[in-house]
């Protein structure tokens, strides 16, 4: 037990030593996320058209919560992710996955339309800049947790950047009072997330969307409460960093969370 506690503390400390998670609250920070997305989704993957301004943006950015990861060594932003929320005041607004998977969702598992709309969001546009994800086989992925990311029992390693961004997703969701998060992803991503303790449930058949993508749902409280010590230590560091950034910016979120 002592070894597990020591290891979890060193995992959180290790993350804090090399990386920082922060919410993109200013226009400059949001533009940093848009530049990362352009580098990954437009230039590297070719999933979106290259744009003259170097920003990858869409209509959902205005209603999204954006998160960045920064390298402490370089001081530069190296990854991002966003949570798309339903447009405030628009009861008819739908999240992107609801349209893409309209005909394949299994509403007997969960019906997004029946949930409190202000309490749900979609995880979207997770990206890590190329130089940080170019191990063999990763050149065409914006960021995915692989079994090999954790190394072997003899030579373990921890995928700090990816886990940090996912912990940022859940910390931001908690701070903003979100209860359910949806994800449209390759089925293997959902499997890898489950393997490392980020519980998610597939809620429909895979559909074609730049390859086969399947919708899944994650319960924010359930995931946070059931993180193993290694992930939880990173989550605590990330949540504290986000809280500090919100306070410094005098940004209003759920006061109980701060």
Q: Predicted regions span which residues?
A:
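Acidic, low-complexity proline/glycine-rich segments
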Residues: 1-6
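Short amphipathic alpha-helix that is part of the acyltransferase structural core
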Residues: 7-55, 62, 66-70, 85
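Beta-rich nucleic-acid/ligand-interaction surfaces
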Residues: 53-60, 188-192
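Glycine-rich acetyl-CoA-binding "A-motif" of GNAT/NAT acetyltransferases
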Residues: 75-78
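Short hydrophobic beta-strand segments that form the core of ligand-binding sensory/regulatory domains
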Residues: 82
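Acyl-donor binding region in acyl/amide transferases
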Residues: 88-218
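Accessory, usually C-terminal, subdomains that scaffold auxiliary metal cofactors
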Residues: 197-256
């Amino acid at each position: 037990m002592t070894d597990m506690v020591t290891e979890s503390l060193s995992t959180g400390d290790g993350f804090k030593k090399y990386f920082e998670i922060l919410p993109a609250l200013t226009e400059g920070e949001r533009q940093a996320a848009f530049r990362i997305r352009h580098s990954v989704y437009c230039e590297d993957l070719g999933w979106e058209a290259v744009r003259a301004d170097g920003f990858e943006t869409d209509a959902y950015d205005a209603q999204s919560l954006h998160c960045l990861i920064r390298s402490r060594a370089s001081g530069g932003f190296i990854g991002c992710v966003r949570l798309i929320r339903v447009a405030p005041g628009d009861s008819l607004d739908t999240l992107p996955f609801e349209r893409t998977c309209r005909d394949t969702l299994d509403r007997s598992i969960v019906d997004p339309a029946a949930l409190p709309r202000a309490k749900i969001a979609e995880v979207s546009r997770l990206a890590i800049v190329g130089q940080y994800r170019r191990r063999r086989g990763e050149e065409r992925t914006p960021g995915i947790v692989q079994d090999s990311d954790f190394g072997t029992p003899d030579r373990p390693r921890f995928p700090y950047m990816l886990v940090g961004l996912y912990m940022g997703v859940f910390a931001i969701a908690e701070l903003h009072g979100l209860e359910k998060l949806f994800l449209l992803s390759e089925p293997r991503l959902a499997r890898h997330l489950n393997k490392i303790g980020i519980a998610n449930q597939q809620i429909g058949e895979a559909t074609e969307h730049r390859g086969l993508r399947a919708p899944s749902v994650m319960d924010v409280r359930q995931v946070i409460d059931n993180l193993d010590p290694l992930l939880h230590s990173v989550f605590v560091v990330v949540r504290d960093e986000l809280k500090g950034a919100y306070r410094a910016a005098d940004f209003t979120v759920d006061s109980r969370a701060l």
